[in-house]
Amino acid sequence: MATTKAGGSTKNGRDSHSKRLGAKLYDGQFAKAGAIIYRQRGTRVFPGVNVQRSGDDTLFSLADGYVKYENKRNRKYVSVYPAK
């Protein structure tokens, strides 16, 4: 015979790892070509000048320059403008 009763099982106790989403470069920071600017799920921020969107909606720089976040038509855009 068991000296203690059987312990109950739980269906909880799991969690996924955080995905580290959000801004990786902020307004005014210098971005090299290919640098990740914003990691996201869906299009919270849209690509602007010299910025492209990858398959997982990550925004990255196409040219060297300074990052600029802009609001246009109720959307947030991020652009990279070359240094003058």
Curated annotation (Swiss-Prot):
MF GO annotations: structural constituent of ribosome
Cellular component aspect of the GO annotation: cytosolic large ribosomal subunit
Gene Ontology terms: biological process: translation
Keywords carried by this UniProt record: Ribonucleoprotein, Ribosomal protein
Bias (Polar residues) ranges: 1-11
Keyword Cell inner membrane found: no
Region (Disordered): 1-20
One Pfam family matching this protein: Ribosomal_L27
Stored SUPFAM superfamilies: Ribosomal L27 protein-like
Family matches, as InterPro entries: Ribosomal_bL27 (IPR001684), Ribosomal_bL27_CS (IPR018261)
Domain of life: Bacteria
HAMAP family: Ribosomal_bL27
Family: Belongs to the bacterial ribosomal protein bL27 family.
PANTHER family assigned to the protein according to its UniProt record, in alphabetical order: LARGE RIBOSOMAL SUBUNIT PROTEIN BL27M, RIBOSOMAL PROTEIN L27
Database matches in NCBIfam families: L27
Protein name stated in the entry: Large ribosomal subunit protein bL27
Naturally occurring in which organism (per UniProt): Mycoplasmopsis synoviae (strain 53) (Mycoplasma synoviae)
Lineage: Bacteria, Bacillati, Mycoplasmatota, Mycoplasmoidales, Metamycoplasmataceae
Gene of this entry: rpmA
